[in-house]
UniProtKB/Swiss-Prot annotation:
Biological processes, Gene Ontology terms: lipid catabolic process
Protein name: Uncharacterized protein y4iI
Entry's localization field: Cell membrane
Disulfide bridges in this chain: none
Residues annotated as transmembrane: 23-43, 69-89, 143-163, 250-270, 357-377, 432-452, 644-664
Start and end residues of each PNPLA domain: 23-335
Active site: 74, 322
Length: 703
């Protein structure tokens, strides 16, 4: 039987007080490797605590922490889904070959999760196995359904379901674990709200699937008024573990994997997925909103011909793409699942909070802030910006996120990438400009190199360790959740903080670091691609580009004349397109210091400023740059840009050597580019002359 302590904390007879957690994982594309690393270390820390309790170790907290819910969008959904399966079994942790004395020797705990995020999804496979640039998905004349070979992700999903080991439930995971995965439903679901005098019709494309995973854990969870009455599909871990071979994989788990891949189906880049469900799932669906839905909830207005009613169900299928397109931060689903009495918020005070949402957000770098006069008043530039604006707006959730940032809130936490090199004795710690290696190309960059993804996985583990030690805390004098007298001090776990009102408060970690979770996770070495690997990458991209373009021309056009014209355009424009892609890749790799062969000249200049100028010179939109144009792009002072350009001009023979156009008149601004990008002889000869209008000439940002 369950009983409540006088302070309201849910307890079980004969057990300790419980602190409940839920994890929300944001969309991240290839930076999902970071979220996976965070989850990996969290499982390691909770395992180590359970082991210490079983061994009777002293000075441990007198309460338990339990995992009740997960939610994810895009890469976050894939991480949550595979993480749940990985947590159902036990693999021996992988270790570093030569760990530093006193540092963490464990490389990863959840091998299935590591392989899914680090080993498998890559643009260029080092061993020749199928990768994201392979052409196997186009074999046999099949049509193009995505720019990249999404068969790789299908294979990852299939491998994740190969849970042939023994099911080993974890004591700190709910026996009925709620998992929400976000979907972008391209078909849409119609709704109507009735008013006096009429009705308002609308369509939602923000969809989700809700699974209740049975048997991954043994903790009998407390009731969830929101999730327990929401439409959810129960799925048993026992039906997966022990299954052997593709033919015996349970269909409900195949649907589970398909939903996770659908949530991660980035539009155009990765193939969409078809989700098969039924209208009854929507009749019971609840929304994480502040209105009470106990007696009234929105009901879809399906077509009359379907004859949908309380007793009549109807099959409903739809095409789904990236769930992060509409809801990239599914924080609210976990928050409502943890609520005792929704929509009333949980207790937030550090002395009373007994449940919390942990949000994993892999992209700490916000969207760029446009300068004056941007975007230009052109049709294409406005169209591009409208799409970006809509996407950024749906991610703007001040009502949810402001509460996370509030100083006194201890029921909502966020962990995001921070790359801070260990300081030398007496030195000052300084966070690096770029935290994750997967951040380039809008998040696709992690697929460039396995070392990029491994770096982010290890950074996730390191950041999680610091987060558990310093940020996931409660007041030392919490009403119901206590450490033994003096235990936190003996473990050197007390964190003293000065609040904005000047008062000093002592906090203790909610999850203690003990056993193999205590040694420091090593600082991962920043990963770089070598020039040969980069050249191979560009070559493989070109092969995929040409194959996809030719297949599109073949399957999407019926006119022979049109096919001939498009193939001719591909022939004459191929080199220009490939060069644009090469420069775009190189621009970001150089700016983020993620490619070898680009050492900077010795100078008293900040390296990240120098790389920003180099990136501006590599911008494929311009052939020649002015000091003012570079300053506008980099947000650096013009005098600093001039100093950097002068320094780079002296880097003879280096990739970073700058070239100054010799034809510039004294009354015009100087023009710069890299030596490797000098205009051709013809373009140089015709620059500024009227015949140049008949030929392609360099693009210059004179204004």
């Amino acid at each position: 039987m369950r009983r409540r302590s006088t302070e309201g904390t849910v307890m079980t007879d004969g057990s300790k007080p419980t602190f409940e957690i839920g994890i929300a994982m944001s969309g991240a594309i290839s930076a999902g490797a970071y979220s996976a690393g965070v989850f990996d270390f969290l499982i390691q820390a909770l395992d180590a605590w359970e082991k210490a309790k079983a061994e009777g170790a002293p000075d441990l907290p007198e309460y338990d922490v339990r995992l009740k819910a997960l939610s994810g969008a895009s890469a976050g959904a894939i991480t949550a889904a595979i993480g749940v399966i990985a947590a159902g079994g036990r693999e021996a942790p992988a270790t570093f070959p030569s760990p530093a004395p006193g540092s963490q020797n464990i490389r990863f705990t959840l091998g299935r999760l590591y392989r899914s995020w680090v080993t498998s999804p890559t643009l260029v496979s080092p061993d020749g196995s199928p990768d994201l640039l392979s052409l196997e998905d186009l074999a046999g004349g099949r049509p193009v359904i995505s720019v990249l070979n999404a068969n790789v992700l299908t294979a990852i999903g299939a491998e994740a379901l190969e849970a042939t080991g023994t099911l080993s439930p974890r004591a700190y995971v709910a026996s009925s674990l709620h998992l929400y995965m976000m979907l972008s439903n391209l078909r849409g679901v119609p709704y109507a709200i009735h008013f006096n005098g009429g009705q308002y019709n609308m369509m939602t494309h923000a969809d989700r699937v809700h699974y209740v995973v049975e048997g991954i854990g043994t903790w009998k969870p407390t009731p969830s008024p929101f999730a327990d009455t929401d439409s959810g599909t129960s799925i048993a871990a026992t039906s997966l573990f022990g299954a052997a071979g593709a033919s015996t994989r349970p269909p409900e788990w195949l649907a589970f994997a398909n939903a996770a891949l659908a949530s991660g189906a980035f539009p155009i880049g990765l193939s969409p997925r078809v989700i098969a469900t039924a209208t009854s799932q929507y009749a019971k669906a609840k929304f994480p909103i502040s209105e009470d839905q106990s007696e009234l909830r929105p009901i879809p207005t399906w077509p009359d011909a379907w004859h949908v009613s309380a007793s009549q169900d109807y099959p409903f299928s739809f095409v789904s793409v990236d769930g992060g397109l509409i809801n990239n931060d599914p924080f609210e689903f976990v928050r409502f699942t943890l609520m005792k009495d929704p929509p009333r918020p949980n207790e937030r005070n550090a002395e009373k909070a007994d449940r919390a949402v942990i949000m994993i957000a892999p992209f700490p770098e916000g969207p760029p802030f446009l300068g004056d006069g941007e975007p230009p008043l052109g049709v294409l530039s406005i169209a591009r910006r409208v799409v970006t604006a809509l996407r950024q707006q749906v991610r703007f959730k001040p009502d949810q996120l402001l509460a996370v940032a509030a100083e006194g809130t201890h029921s909502r936490f966020m962990i995001s990438p921070h790359r801070v090199p260990p300081s030398t004795p007496g030195g000052e710690e300084r966070e690096e400009t770029f935290s994750i290696a997967s951040g380039l190309l809008g998040g696709f960059g992690g697929f460039v190199l396995e070392a990029f993804r491994d770096h982010d996985y290890q950074l996730g583990r390191r950041n999680c360790q610091y987060f558990l030690m310093r940020h996931l805390t409660i007041d030392k004098n919490h009403q119901t959740l206590h450490w033994p007298e003096g235990a936190a001090e003996r473990r050197n776990a007390v964190i003293s903080k000065t609040l904005s009102d000047g008062s000093m408060h002592d906090y203790v970690p909610i999850i203690p670091l003990v056993g193999d979770a205590l040694p420091e996770v090593p600082y991962p070495r920043w990963a770089r691609i070598d020039e040969n690997a980069f050249a191979l990458l560009v070559k493989r991209i070109e092969a995929r580009l040409v194959a996809v373009a030719r297949r599109l021309v073949s399957t999407e056009t019926t006119s022979a004349r049109m096919k001939l014209g498009l193939n001719f355009l591909l022939l004459v424009g191929r080199n220009r397109i490939v060069d644009y892609i090469r420069l775009t890749l190189l621009q970001e790799l150089v700016m983020r210091d993620q490619i070898e062969g680009w050492p900077l000249p010795a100078a008293d200049l900040r390296p990240d400023f120098v790389r920003a100028v180099l990136a501006a010179l590599l911008d494929p939109a311009f052939d020649l740059r002015t000091e003012a144009g570079i300053a506008r792009t980099t947000k650096l002072d013009t005098s600093l840009v001039r100093e950097i350009l002068s320094t780079l001009a002296g880097a003879a023979g280096a990739n970073c050597q700058v070239w100054l156009a010799p034809w510039t008149r004294t009354d015009e601004p100087s023009l710069y580019t890299l030596v490797s990008r000098r205009p051709s002889f013809l373009a140089t000869l015709l620059q500024g002359r009227s015949p140049a209008r008949l030929f392609a000439k360099p693009v210059v940002d004179r204004k």
